[in-house]
Amino acid sequence: MTKNKNVIEVEGKVVECLRSAMFTVELENGHQVLAHISGKIRKNYIKIMLEDRVLVELPPYDLTRGRIVFRYRN
């Protein structure tokens, strides 16, 4: 999904919607991260709701924050 090779891509589920397009995402391994939506999702008006499965990019230096880059169809 990404051109940057320094990120970790992991699947998760949205468990909480916060303000300013921020979400709490529970990853497959049970950890919870704070994630914001990427520019392409924002530009194309893709809605992210509770219980949606998403793909999150995590930077290697801070594994508590991430960016939602893809929403899977349910």
Swiss-Prot record:
InterPro entries, alphabetized: NA-bd_OB-fold (IPR012340), RNA-binding_domain_S1_IF1 (IPR006196), S1_domain (IPR003029), TIF_IF1 (IPR004368)
This protein's UniProt keywords: Cytoplasm, Initiation factor, Protein biosynthesis, RNA-binding, rRNA-binding
A Pfam match: eIF-1a
Main location: cytoplasm
Record note on quaternary structure: Component of the 30S ribosomal translation pre-initiation complex which assembles on the 30S ribosome in the order IF-2 and IF-3, IF-1 and N-formylmethionyl-tRNA(fMet); mRNA recruitment can occur at any time during PIC assembly.
Disulfide topology: none
Coiled coil: none
Keyword Acyltransferase attributed: no
Protein name stated in the entry: Translation initiation factor IF-1 2
Domain of life according to the entry: Bacteria
The keyword Cell inner membrane is assigned to this record: no
